[in-house]
Amino acid sequence: MPLKILVLGAGATGGYFGGRLAQAAHLGKSDIDVSFLVRPKRAETLKARGLNVESPQGSFGIPVRTVLHTELKPEYDLVLLSCKAYDLESSILAIYPGMRPDTCVLPVLNGLAHFERLDREFGALRVLGGCCHIAGNLTPEGLVRQMTELQRITFGLRPQNSTAGQAILDALADAFRQTPVDLRYSDQVLQEIWEKFVLLATLAGMTCLMRGAVGDIVATDEGTTLMQGMLAECETAATHAGHASRPQVHAATAELLSTRDSTFTASMLRDLESGGRTEGAHIVGDMLARARAAGPSTPLLAIAWAHLQAREARLKRERSAT
């Protein structure tokens, strides 16, 4: 029987990675069965125009199967969860009708805090390990646009997972190998997730705090020192958790965060500057809590988190006054 996958959403992340799986099936390269759980308006767009992806690895447009929350049945082997952290609760409610007792969930959210919540809801046996790297957006016309060359998905078994999860991930890996996606099927997936978490928390904390790209920050008198300091605080948390970054990864991260003229920023900065919601609590706030568990000296993470909280407090105050 082909693997039946439910992809939550068809936006920048779910639309890209789910779309690549659907494209492989559409071309006859894979027998994987992909459905997209979407809202009515997005379903109408996809029915009328198909799923359209603009990508440096090859743009495409294909018809896709969509399903509404009210139409879900418990018939899926795997749910690919790619929501923003602040939408986690509503996403859990959305996928529930599609979950069998043995359905696995593969979250590719940023950070780590979501694992505890998903484990409580579905059981740690069924919540697999994963993360992804992609910069993209969904245009007003419904086009999934990949903005850079980077498009990687990483997944693997967590220590708590069942053997059934292994078979599901094997089939998923086989399907992704028929696509242009950079696949990492890892036997140390928590290490990979932690290494991304360290990079992202440093990048988001500093670019939001300084309101600038990496190159803007390191061009200042104290920018490189501050960037290195926040990276060190995040690495302290990772080391305390037993997942210190591997030397080559740490070196690559440090270089990425110290490159002059770099326009690299976190998507959190774009969300912040556009007045949108951010994953501040899930990324910076959670990293601060984990770093403090390792030791009390976390001044830069504390400032970055206070900055994001102050922004939320101001928005709340201004909205309540109107």
State what each model feature region is:
Residues 67, 97-98, 120-130, 141-251:
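Internal alpha-helical scaffold of NAD(P)-dependent oxidoreductase catalytic cores
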Residues 1-59:
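NAD(P)+-binding Rossmann beta1-loop-alpha1 motif at the extreme N-terminus of oxidoreductases
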Residues 58-144:
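Rossmann-like NAD(P)(H) cofactor-binding subdomain of soluble oxidoreductases
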Residues 2, 224, 228-322:
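NAD(P)-dependent Rossmann-like dehydrogenase/reductase catalytic/cofactor-binding core
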Residues 6, 33-35, 106, 128, ...:
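A structural signal for isolated positions on well-ordered beta-strands in alpha/beta enzyme cores
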Residues 42-47, 115-116, 239:
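Short, charged/polar "capping" segments at the starts of alpha-helices
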Residues 2-4, 77, 103, 151:
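Nucleotide donor/acceptor-binding cores
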